[in-house]
């Protein structure tokens, strides 16, 4: 898992992989594009 210099703010986004990320920075750091704002139907990943 990569270490990302992301702010610790909770503004959930749903990634293209169907997972919820705490914020868009974390999603992008994991190589995932943002599908939509807000949570996906599944749990949050940090």
Curated annotation (Swiss-Prot):
GO terms for molecular function: serine-type endopeptidase inhibitor activity. SMART domains: KAZAL. InterPro entries: Kazal_dom (IPR002350), Kazal_dom_sf (IPR036058), Serpin (IPR053265). It comes from the Eukaryota. The record marks 8-9 as: Reactive bond (tryptase). CDD domains: KAZAL_FS. Pfam families: Kazal_1 (PF00050). Keywords: Disulfide bond, Protease inhibitor, Serine protease inhibitor. The keyword Glycosyltransferase does not apply. Disulfide bonds join 4-29, 6-25, 14-40. The keyword Glycoprotein does not apply. Coiled coil: none annotated. Residues 1-42 form the Kazal-like domain. Acts as an inhibitor of human tryptase, trypsin and chymotrypsin. Probably acts to block host defense mechanisms. This is Leech-derived tryptase inhibitor C. It comes from Hirudo medicinalis (Medicinal leech).
